Amino acid sequence: MRSVTSMRLEGCAAVSTGRIRFYVATAMHGRVSTLGRVVYVAPHLSATFAVHEAHNKLGWCVSDTESGGRAGFSLTSEDGAIADAIAELSKRTDADMRRARKRLRQLVAKA
């Protein structure tokens, strides 16, 4: 796995979605450095960083663990705006989180 993490990994698995295969590592509650970006993960969020097997491209998934870890966004774009929006999720209040999630959905729709 090529994504670089500076935190404890919760698990690692190979995940297939159609013809696309990812190696996935999940990190909880801390700091992740990957592809030159540092993302802070708040206690109520988990973040998954995936590397595309064939093209070595980064994919993202951020889940809200307060809602059972099922609500989240699966992102396979390298768009910097998406990475920025994910990083912002960890610094927001509950009201701001709703706006940030809406913004993430808009960015994903455009990607």
Task: Label every PLM stretch briefly.
Residues L58-C61, T65:
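Conserved, surface-exposed functional patches that form binding/active-site neighborhoods
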Residues H52-N56:
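Short beta-strand micro-motifs enriched in acidic
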Residues A81-A85:
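Stable alpha-helical structural segments in soluble proteins, enriched in small hydrophobic residues
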Residues T65-D79:
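A short, exposed loop/beta-hairpin motif centered on an aromatic-Gly-Thr core
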Residues P43-T48, T65-G68:
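Short, solvent-exposed coil/turn segments at beta-strand boundaries
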Residues I86-V108:
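Anionic, Ser/Thr-rich low-complexity intrinsically disordered regions
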Residues R2-H44:
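Negatively charged, low-complexity tracts enriched in Asp/Glu with abundant Ser/Thr
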